[in-house]
Amino acid sequence: GTITTVDNQQNGTRVSAPWIAIDAQGDSQAATLAPPEDLTKVGWYGRSAWFGQDKGSSVMTSHINYAGKASYGSIFITLRKGDPITITDSKGNVYHYVVENDPFYLNKSNQEEYKKQTQNTINKMNGENKLVLVTCGGAYVGGNLGYEDNVIVSAKLANNDKSGVKAGKDK
């Protein structure tokens, strides 16, 4: 299955994970990390790095559920270390990622600590490129927080063969 995400510069990006059947349109209009209300969409955070860049986090987000229905965030939380994720952009560039950690929870109640933690994961603009999937988790508390936690899954660019192609990226 695939997830399709649309970027203002590179329309038609497809994200696939062969171990699960998923298919959604993407949304990258917001400059804030807010999942699309449309459950058929997964959002790419427009201020994050593009997939396969030399550095920074490439961030995608989805609701875990919305209006009583499950969304793609409910799939994010099932990912496990070693699961493959492949991204193909509209130009045919293919990026291979491997999940590097089981999902972990960032509690949002202490905003100072939360901000520090997100700068090391979600908002990271240096270090090697990683794919970061973000959804909500924990108890629903309402208000500005919604859920008490964010659930984070990160994936690193996969090693490639010795063909000279940038690691994790096909020509």
Name each region found by the language model.
Residues 1-171:
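Solvent-exposed, non-transmembrane regions of membrane-associated and secreted proteins
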